[in-house]
Amino acid sequence: MFEIKDLNVHFGGIHAIKGISLRVEAGEIVTLIGANGAGKTTTLRTASGLKAPTTGSVWLEGNDITKVSAQQRVNLGMSHVPEGRRVFAQMSVLENLELGAFLRKDRGNLTADFDTVYSRFPVLADRRKQLAGTLSGGEQQMLAM
């Protein structure tokens, strides 16, 4: 479970995020929709530890991670994947996944984790040996996630 409670974020004198609360249960998929400048990216950057909130809290699996660094959040299984299809074009899908897991301390479950990725994005399983740069834009975004 992931939860944001009464999140407020400022950029200098600008109150960018005003009291957002959000709860996402395991297995749910949630989309943030809004106009340019509405705070979608700021909310995600704050949730992933890339921006500190002014007030409010961020919770993961019942633990307050508000003051946990972005790197530590990655170790907990949480990360921020911005738009832009940032993949290594000259490497295969599998090589991109392996590179993404390179810094993991627990490397014993990589095969199971890759199988989980492939179950969520079956097209990546079909293209695991294909160069990432030849994937469609949507497929590249799946791989980046």
Please name every model-derived segment.
Residues L131-L135:
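Conserved ABC ATPase signature
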Residues G12, V30, V68, V93-A112, ...:
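ABC-type ATPase nucleotide-binding domains, specifically the catalytic core motifs of the NBD
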Residues I33-A35:
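The feature captures the beta-strand-to-loop junction immediately N-terminal to the Walker
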Residues V30-T31, H80:
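Short beta-strand immediately N-terminal to the Walker A/P-loop
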Residues S48:
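Helix-to-loop junction immediately C-terminal to a conserved catalytic motif
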Residues G56-N63, L76, N109-F114:
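Conserved ABC transporter NBD signature motif
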Residues F2-I4, I17:
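Conserved structural motif at the start of ABC-family nucleotide-binding domains
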